A protein has these predicted regions:
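Thiamine diphosphate
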Residues: 1-165, 169, 303, ...
């Protein structure tokens, strides 16, 4: 086991995938000689050659269209969409073709689409968005997002090995979090984890908001409030068994994500909890997310993003019922 950043863990996972399977191909904007804008693919083109790690034009729809063609020819493409806000030109290819191909033709498309996403990095417009709900809603796609270096390595391995398309959302603000990883550890798609045990309130988060939820749990403990944090890891398929096991214990739930609350992914989680645990809940399920406005300029993003205080306030409100 060694301590590496999430960025390095993803790089190592890609390197190991390229080594173990000659059909794995990596491509996207600046992923070759430059190694990507975040240097996630640093050194891979030099190690594996331009035929397996290559740059593309600035055309996201074409990037995904090429991935479809390569997958149909027996390859395992791993295209990168450089930033979250650049994925929309590829939306038609992903939703109309990538997601539907297996049901339409019986042919699997083993495509893993890597997408750096979410905010809190002081970026400009189109570089800090949270489009995960669009794709989690789309039948035929698997959607995952790690919050730790170890999960990033293992989930990416699982995604590349999967016979069906996976969108792999990478929380940019977590790229330089450093932790020990075990390359032999396996994390199957569709399995959440208990990131912090507690008994008073369940806080459900994923990707970039897991760290905020853990900070809130630590702050709450100082006030003798016990928060359990669930890291979803996988949005589709969604592991409701782990979520419900926690809610049955705490009888209260708060869902946190960076995307706007209105029609955000948290609405699905909250609806499922409310339906399946109606007789157990001692408070309404709370949702915390970004404001219902386009992602703001960098100087205002701290006002937009969920923070520890908002989570603690929701936990206090939940505990105040009954």
């Amino acid at each position: 086991m060694e301590a590496v950043t999430m960025a390095k863990a993803i790089n190592l996972s890609l390197r190991d995938a390229l080594t173990s399977d000659d059909n794995v191909l990596i491509f996207g904007e600046d992923v070759g000689a430059l190694g990507g804008v975040f240097r996630i693919t640093d050194g891979l083109q030099k190690a594996f050659g331009e035929e397996r790690v290559f740059d593309t034009p600035l055309a996201e729809s074409a990037i995904i269209g090429v991935a479809v063609g390569l997958a149909l020819r027996g390859f395992r493409p791993v295209p990168e969409i450089q930033f979250d806000g650049f994925i929309y030109p590829a939306f038609e290819q992903i939703v109309s073709h990538v997601a539907k191909y297996r049901n339409r033709s019986g042919v699997s498309l083993p495509i893993t689409i890597r997408v750096p996403f979410a905010g809190n990095i002081g970026a400009v417009e189109h570089h800090s968005e949270s489009p995960e709900a669009y794709f989690a809603h789309t039948a035929g796609l698997k959607v995952v997002t790690p919050s730790t270096p170890g999960d990033a390595y293992a989930l990416l391995q699982a995604a590349i090995e999967d016979p069906d398309p996976v969108i792999f959302f990478e929380p940019k603000a977590r790229y330089y979090l450093k932790e020990e990883i075990d390359p032999a550890a396996r994390v199957p798609i569709g399995q959440a984890r208990v990131a912090h045990e507690g008994s008073g309130v369940t806080v459900i988060a994923y990707g970039p908001t897991v760290s905020v939820a853990l900070q809130a749990a630590k702050a709450a403990a100082a006030e003798q409030i016990s928060i359990e944090v669930i890291d979803l890891r996988s949005l589709s398929p969604l592991d409701m068994d782990t979520v419900m096991a926690s809610v049955r214990k705490t009888h209260r739930a708060v869902v946190v994500h960076e995307a706007p609350v209105f029609c955000g992914f948290g609405a699905e989680v909250a609806a499922r909890i409310s339906h399946d645990a109606f007789d157990l809940l001692e408070a309404p399920v709370a949702r915390i997310g970004g404001l219902n406005v386009p992602y703001p300029p960098a100087r205002y993003e701290k006002l937009y993003l969920p923070d520890v205080d908002r989570i603690l306030q929701a936990a206090d409100t939940a505990l105040g019922y009954g």
